[in-house]
């Protein structure tokens, strides 16, 4: 809505921006895994929260199509480093018998945030305008980083490999593992369809049904709330 309404981009240009968003997320996820192995999950989580806070503040000053594509790619390349590091951290902050439950609670927290975020975003846009979102996004990222720093204890050492983990010699190359590649392809197809809702559904609500930002945010938030339930 911001790209078409405030920046005046065409639907095709919005598609390219979302592609840059996805590519940045892909790079960030890969880099987050690498950094978690190199420097540990804790600093990776911390800086992948604080740094995007600054980048979101700066994003509001980008006013060109190409500039926004590059900027959103950089933002997501840093922000999505958090995901793999966060999942690695579960081994340090949860017991083996609670690991599955821990992943479930993480997913519940994500969906609860997804239900509150769009609703709050629609309200903020209605009251303060689009540019205020950049400040709110940046501030929440920075606050999340401070929560990690102040309330999440840094482990004395990275969690050791599982006792029953197979030796490296017998681990399969993921690119030669047929069932795993099939699973990845299935995840790709699911994401290919589902993630279009972030770009197309808000425009559909606005252009076809004439809804304003606040009810659009409430409808998108309802989706996350139902998944949470």
Give, region by region, the residue ranges found by the protein language model.
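Juxtamembrane intracellular "pre-TM" segments in multi-pass secondary transporters
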Residues: 154-184
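Symmetry-related core transmembrane helices of the 12-TM Major Facilitator Superfamily/SLC fold
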Residues: 134-149
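C-terminal ends and interior cores of transmembrane alpha-helices
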Residues: 50-63
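Short amphipathic helix-loop junctions that connect adjacent transmembrane helices
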Residues: 1-12, 199-214
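Residue-level signature of mid-helix packing/kink "hotspots" within the transmembrane helices
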Residues: 22-26, 30, 114-115, 224-228
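Cytoplasmic helix-loop-helix junction between adjacent transmembrane helices
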Residues: 73-110
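Pair of pore-lining "gating" transmembrane helices in MFS-fold secondary transporters
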Residues: 1, 5, 177-193
């Amino acid at each position: 809505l911001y790209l078409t309404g405030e920046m005046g981009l065409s639907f095709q240009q919005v598609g390219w921006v979302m592609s840059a968003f996805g590519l940045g997320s892909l790079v960030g996820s890969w880099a987050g895994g690498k950094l978690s192995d190199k420097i540990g999950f804790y600093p990776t989580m911390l800086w992948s929260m604080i740094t995007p806070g600054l980048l979101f503040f700066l994003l509001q000053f980008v006013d060109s199509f190409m500039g926004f594509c590059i900027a959103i790619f950089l933002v997501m390349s840093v922000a999505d480093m958090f995901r793999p590091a966060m999942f690695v951290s579960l081994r340090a902050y949860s017991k083996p018998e609670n690991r599955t439950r821990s992943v479930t609670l993480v997913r519940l927290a994500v969906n609860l945030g997804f239900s509150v975020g769009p609703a709050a975003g629609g309200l903020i846009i209605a009251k303060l305008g689009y540019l205020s979102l950049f400040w709110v996004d940046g501030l929440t990222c920075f606050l999340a980083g401070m929560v990690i720093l102040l309330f999440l204890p840094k482990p004395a050492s990275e969690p050791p490999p599982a006792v029953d983990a197979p030796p490296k010699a017998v681990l399969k190359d993921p690119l030669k593992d047929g069932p795993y590649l099939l699973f990845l392809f299935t995840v790709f197809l699911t994401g290919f369809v589902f993630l279009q809702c972030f770009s197309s559904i808000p425009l559909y609500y606005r252009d076809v049904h004439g809804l304003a930002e606040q009810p659009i945010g409430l409808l998108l938030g309802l989706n996350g709330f139902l998944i949470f339930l």
